[in-house]
Swiss-Prot record:
It holds the Pfam family Aldedh. GO terms for cellular component: cytoplasm. It catalyses: an aldehyde + NAD(+) + H2O = a carboxylate + NADH + 2 H(+). PANTHER family: ALDEHYDE DEHYDROGENASE-RELATED. The gene is ALTA10. Pathway: Alcohol metabolism; ethanol degradation; acetate from ethanol: step 2/2. Gene3D superfamilies: Aldehyde Dehydrogenase, Chain A, domain 1 (3.40.605.10), Aldehyde Dehydrogenase, Chain A, domain 2 (3.40.309.10). This is Aldehyde dehydrogenase. It comes from Alternaria alternata (Alternaria rot fungus). It is found in: Cytoplasm. The active site is at residues 264, 298. GO terms for biological process: ethanol catabolic process.
Amino acid sequence: MTSVKLSTPQTGEFEQPTGLFINNEFVKAVDGKTFDVINPSTEEVICSVQEATEKDVDIAVAAARKAFNGPWRKETPENRGKLLNKLADLFEKNADLIAAVEALDNGKAFSMAKNVDVPAAAGCLRYYGGWADKIEGKVVDTAPDSFNYIRKEPIGVCGQIIPWNFPILMWSWKIGPAIATGNTVVLKTAEQTPLSAYIACKLIQEAGFPPGVINVITGFGKIAGAAMSAHMDIDKIAFTGSTVVGRQIMKSAAGSNLKKVTLELGGKSPNIVFADADLDEAIHWVNFGIYFNHGQACCAGSRIYVQEEIYDKFIQRFKERAAQNAVGDPFAADTFQGPQVSQLQFDRIMGYIEEGKKSGATIETGGNRKGDKGYFIEPTIFSNVTEDMKIQQEEIFGPVCTISKFKTKADVIKIGNNTTYGLAAAVHTSNLTTAIEVANALRAGTVWVNSYNTLHWQLPFGGYKESGIGRELGEAALDNYIQTKTVSIRLGDVLFG
């Protein structure tokens, strides 16, 4: 079987595809292997899905190549845009179902998935649908007897590997620009969270995409992901995930056909609060900056720096605010923070909490498992940290942050940049000059002022340093999926002789 019946409080019973999506069909894996998908709230098995191996990757790539070399290559930009817009419409129509499935295997709050993730995914698809017929070349005049034009062409077959923290959102971030520019896709989901991607594949069928244009597989990174990054017939690989895996993908891409690479990787982002900031607003955004999505965000504001004049007041207020975050059942109406995605992530985060204690940092609040079932962790704040501590330098990827004090603007710029990462940062201040000076000085791809995590599909997102290569979202993301061709036509007589 390539589907099962599932049920959630918001949807009732529904049909959940479990097969690999290749050539517009849900199919079994060649080797017939499956693996279990776990509900992080209950630690129970939701269902089993097909497990792709190298053989399945080959089949999916062949389907994508056939589609790229076939009618899809001749599809008009207008029609590509219409397909993406139709898909966006279907996302909105099926928002409850997509959000419920996200809550089921990812553990994020249903309310958050419905009100944030799904609308943002639909918005992203619609945005790139609008770009499809606006990708233009140009004519360059070099001489009277020469006609030169520059074309923007699709790269070809694109491999895309997405993470488990924002399954449907990352699906859209990857699919949107690739399809708008005329490519075909083989996308691998994270093994922890495959279900919403397969719901989206049903919508691909309904929207009318031709076979082979979008192929989605589930499998493990060491097998299916490795096969994709080393595949000789994949022209480009895009990956969102850890810096460690990003390095491996770069090596595989270089060692195979030197495929083009886009990487959106880890972060350890500074969230800076100056003494002149609106305290209530700053506390709201600092709380949202770290605890949104259970701290499972690459851009999470996990290093909080507060100017010393307001440090004591801020930390007391922030502790009180963090303790108010409702942690629990993703399907409960008031839940803000659900469980971590897996036992592995739960153990990893608890390990960092223990490391913080051993290194001499002080737990201001949290630090414990919440309940005895599910991968729930209390919102946790560490103080009395030093810049060389692991909890200050390494990405924890959970509801854990550190808070430190600083004296001057120059001091906080220096320590804010004291990281191998450079994905995001924030500055909270009522002084526009301070905001601009600090934002310009921070080595980060995105800097928010008096807010946090306010991403938008129109704005480029990506990192400096070890936080990645290339940019997602905005017009900038289109560059990841196009090649530039120069055509030069000689006019008139022979140039020499």
